[in-house]
């Protein structure tokens, strides 16, 4: 594998100098040769520097790097998350074929289906008004309390699928900052509100602090006995859930082989199911399952997650590009970049290989983005003319949900196509100068101004096109990126499924709380921390 990486690196200088304009001019079939599709989902990577030789090397990299072997280990239930001795089976949660999936010799599918059925029954009862609040009123608002994977997925997907909402209004609380829950509680009435507390262990500090605030909100307005009518939980800690006052019939579990950032397919998706209904939630799972099958069966050169991961690895570890921009041209996908930020950076932000040795080269990139066209008026300037190359990944649906606003969607499409073309083509000095002189500017001034209007071009982008942002399409898109992260992680030779970097800050915060509360001295902490504690204490009222 290292030899192939070195071969790729030996071409890096030439690759960076690749003139994509010339490549398209020389090859009328470049788009068709460097784009692949799964049904209506098209991935165009022709505007990257990938050529026939690089693609062959990338395919060899996947083969020699053991990506296919590791892929089968994941799907078959092997404990590939070896630092926690856990299988990685979020794919089982959307295994619509019901093919047995074994963990320690036991088929997990009966349990998966049982939880899904219980979720569906509960969601239907809330949506229909059969399950009411303590005063006999139907539930009109559902507030999910969670953080990280228990929040980012449900928030993102619920917003993305807004056209399919026909259930109670959905709200989400995650931050331990009291302002977050305070602002949400102002929007609802206690007698018509259901809280879902999402915490596997029922000990997550942020979640349980907010849950206690929510409990007080209900108990103060409706009495202690009302708590059981206004809460549900997604957890495996049944004793703690019961102590909180939540009926065991309203508790939905999931398993150690489901990582938080991969948990939207599990009971963590309950608020989404309540919003869009069990049938649409099933279609969401169907879309992901279609990508799972494609990922397992399609040849590497026709395999969307494989190609996306290989190109991502190439950009990061061969060409050295430190970030990637996720740019969905869909306002309802406004939280998708943040969702992928966690998925990618928590998975592949590692510095140690599976052998326990330091990673050679780079691991995961910084992932960020905003929906178009908002981003065009914020940070695209740097993507077009900055000194860092930032690979861009665009997404656009051919059809929107507002037929009366078709012209606006056409404007959206024209913008995303223009951006990918502009990044590729750029603008030469001669073109910039001619544009100025055509407007009447004299030669001397045009020579001075034109350099500021030059775009180097050759800036890589990938564009995804699909029919419409349905539950099926969203499930497909998420699964595509999940498997992309997996492919890159295998090539980085890291464990993509633990997150020890999250733990240190938690431990230190626990120790600092008594200091912040004034119960203990800051002595023993560094001088900066001591100084900050003192400054905050002085300002506190």
UniProtKB/Swiss-Prot annotation:
InterPro entries, alphabetized: G6P_Isomerase, G6P_Isomerase_C, Phosphoglucose_isomerase_CS, SIS_dom_sf, SIS_PGI_1, SIS_PGI_2
Keywords of this entry: Cytoplasm, Gluconeogenesis, Glycolysis, Isomerase
Reactions catalysed: alpha-D-glucose 6-phosphate = beta-D-fructose 6-phosphate
Pathway: Carbohydrate biosynthesis; gluconeogenesis; Carbohydrate degradation; glycolysis; D-glyceraldehyde 3-phosphate and glycerone phosphate from D-glucose: step 2/4
Pfam families, sorted: PGI
Molecular-function GO term, any one: monosaccharide binding
HAMAP family: G6P_isomerase
Annotated EC: 5.3.1.9
Job description of the protein: Catalyzes the reversible isomerization of glucose-6-phosphate to fructose-6-phosphate.
Family: Belongs to the GPI family.
Full protein name: Glucose-6-phosphate isomerase
Keyword Cytoplasm: yes
Residues of the active site: 346 (proton donor), 377, 506
Enzyme class, UniProt record, top EC level: isomerase
SUPFAM superfamilies: SIS domain
Source taxon at top rank: Bacteria
One of the GO biological process terms: glucose 6-phosphate metabolic process
Coiled coil: none
């Amino acid at each position: 594998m290292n030899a192939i990486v070195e071969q790729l690196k030996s071409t890096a200088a030439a690759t960076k100098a690749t003139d994509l304009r010339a490549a398209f001019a020389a090859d009328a079939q470049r788009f068709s040769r460097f784009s692949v599709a799964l049904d209506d989902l098209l991935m165009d990577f022709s505007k990257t520097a990938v050529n026939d030789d690089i693609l062959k090397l990338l395919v060899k990299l996947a083969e020699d790097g053991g990506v296919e072997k590791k892929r089968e280990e994941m799907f078959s239930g092997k404990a590939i998350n070896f630092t926690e001795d856990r299988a990685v089976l979020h794919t089982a949660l959307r295994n619509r074929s019901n093919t047995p999936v074994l963990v320690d010799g036991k088929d997990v599918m009966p349990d998966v289906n049982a939880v899904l059925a219980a979720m569906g029954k509960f969601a239907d009862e809330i949506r229909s008004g059969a399950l009411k609040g303590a005063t006999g009123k139907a539930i009109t608002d559902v507030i999910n309390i969670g953080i990280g994977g228990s929040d980012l997925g449900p928030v993102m997907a619920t917003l993305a699928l807004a056209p399919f909402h026909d259930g109670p209004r959905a709200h989400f609380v995650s931050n331990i900052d009291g302002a977050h829950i305070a602002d949400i509680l102002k929007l609802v009435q206690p007698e018509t509100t259901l809280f879902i507390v999402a915490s596997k262990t029922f000990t997550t500090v942020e979640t349980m602090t907010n849950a206690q605030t929510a409990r007080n909100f209900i108990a103060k307005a409706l009495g202690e006995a009302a708590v059981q009518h206004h809460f549900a939980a997604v957890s495996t800690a049944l004793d703690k859930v019961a102590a909180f006052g939540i009926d065991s019939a309203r508790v939905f579990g999931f398993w150690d082989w489901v990582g938080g950032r991969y948990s939207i397919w599990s009971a963590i998706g309950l608020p989404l199911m309540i919003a869009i209904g069990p049938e649409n939630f099933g279609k969401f799972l169907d879309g992901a399952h279609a990508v799972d099958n494609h990922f397992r069966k399609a040849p590497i050169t026709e395999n969307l997650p494989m190609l996306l991961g290989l190109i991502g690895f190439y950009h990061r570890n061969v060409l050295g590009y430190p970030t990637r921009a996720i740019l969905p041209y869909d306002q309802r996908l406004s939280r998708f970049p943040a969702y992928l930020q966690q998925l990618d950076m928590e998975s592949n932000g590692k510095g140690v290989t599976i052998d326990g040795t330091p990673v050679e080269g780079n691991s995961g990139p910084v992932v960020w983005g905003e929906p178009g066209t908002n981003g065009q008026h914020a940070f695209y300037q740097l993507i077009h003319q900055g000194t860092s190359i930032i690979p861009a990944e665009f997404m656009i649906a051919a059809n929107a949900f507002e037929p009366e606003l078709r012209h606006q969607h056409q404007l959206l499409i024209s913008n995303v196509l223009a951006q990918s073309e502009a990044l590729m083509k750029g603008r030469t000095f001669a073109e910039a100068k001619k544009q100025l002189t055509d407007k009447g500017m004299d030669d001397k001034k045009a020579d001075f101004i034109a350099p500021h209007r030059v775009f180097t071009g050759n800036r890589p982008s990938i564009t995804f096109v699909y029919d419409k942002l349905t539950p099926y399409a969203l499930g497909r898109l998420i699964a595509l990126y999940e498997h992309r992260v997996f492919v890159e992680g295998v090539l980085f030779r890291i464990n993509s499924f633990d997150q020890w970097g999250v733990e240190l800050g938690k431990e230190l915060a626990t120790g600092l709380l008594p200091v912040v509360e004034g119960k203990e001295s800051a002595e023993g902490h560094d001088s900066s921390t001591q100084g900050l504690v003192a400054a905050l204490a002085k300002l506190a009222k």
